[in-house]
């Protein structure tokens, strides 16, 4: 990819999120390019969208130009995946940091939550206090400000037998299909509209109510983990990322 095309893409990103939220200077990018514990590598830009629509527009621009997209939230570096790893990629890399999109919606009287892209375990812990509940992770990740979504995508947790690793079948996410086209997949269990822009705007604005929530048998956690992890004589791995019954969607 030519320098001119990279410069053109940077201009598009600035138009979407503003100059202050598109980082291109080496020194300023360093905190995003290196995980606190694991992973490091160069990106030509770090962009920090302020809402879900900005995030969608950034994804469209980056996918159209064929650059590598690395999604990043708190960047703890606990499991890797939130930074480049080395500098031998075949295409330029852009990091999309989601920490400005940090809202959490409590639904069904606090029985469930919808965490937006940059929501953290810190915030979730505070919101759940009045319901006498705790986040899915309270041992390690909470103490360093890890994100909710990063935990789900990177299979974190599993130390607490009653909760198991982070896992859900209920999510709203973007993916690039086999034809290279970006598409928005709504498996959240909430009727938010028909097109990506409408869906994302309604979600962020909380423009939905109990009638829009679809109650189904989909899981937001592994309800069999506490039994499986006790099967010490089993030859089947108990850990989530080796358990094929829980692989799908964002998990």
Map each language-model feature to its residues.
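Glycine-rich, histidine-containing beta strand-loop boundary motifs that form or position
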Residues: 71-75, 82, 98, 117, ...
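FAD-binding subdomain of flavoenzyme oxidoreductases
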Residues: 105-107, 117, 121-122, 126-251
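N-terminal flexible segment immediately upstream of the FAD-binding catalytic core
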Residues: 1-60, 77-114
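Short conserved micro-motifs on helix faces and helix-strand junctions that flank
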Residues: 48, 72, 115, 146-148
């Amino acid at each position: 990819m030519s320098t001119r095309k990279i410069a053109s893409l940077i201009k598009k990103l600035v138009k979407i999120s503003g100059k202050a939220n598109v980082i291109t200077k080496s020194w300023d990018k360093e905190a995003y390019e290196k995980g606190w514990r694991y992973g490091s590598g160069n990106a030509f830009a770090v962009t920090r969208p302020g809402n879900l629509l900005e995030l969608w527009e950034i994804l469209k621009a980056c996918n159209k130009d064929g650059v590598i997209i690395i999604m990043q939230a708190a960047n703890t570096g606990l499991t890797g995946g939130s930074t480049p790893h080395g500098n031998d990629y075949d295409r330029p890399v852009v990091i999309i940091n989601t920490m400005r999109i940090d809202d959490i919606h409590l639904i069904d009287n606090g029985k469930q939550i919808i965490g937006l892209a940059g929501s953290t375990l810190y915030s979730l812990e505070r919101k759940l206090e009045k319901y006498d509940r705790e986040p899915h992770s309270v041992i390690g990740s909470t103490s360093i400000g890890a994100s909710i979504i990063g935990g789900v995508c990177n299979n974190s947790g599993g130390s607490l037998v009653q909760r198991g690793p982070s896992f859900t079948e209920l999510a709203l996410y973007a993916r690039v299909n086999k034809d290279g086209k970006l598409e928005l997949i709504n498996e959240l269990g909430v009727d938010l509209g028909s097109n990506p822009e409408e869906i994302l705007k309604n979600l962020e604005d909380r423009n939905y109510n109990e009638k829009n929530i679809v109650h189904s048998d989909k899981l937001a956690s592994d309800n069999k983990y506490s039994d499986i992890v006790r099967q010490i004589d089993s030859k089947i791995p108990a850990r989530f990322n080796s358990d094929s019954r829980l692989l799908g969607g964002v998990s």
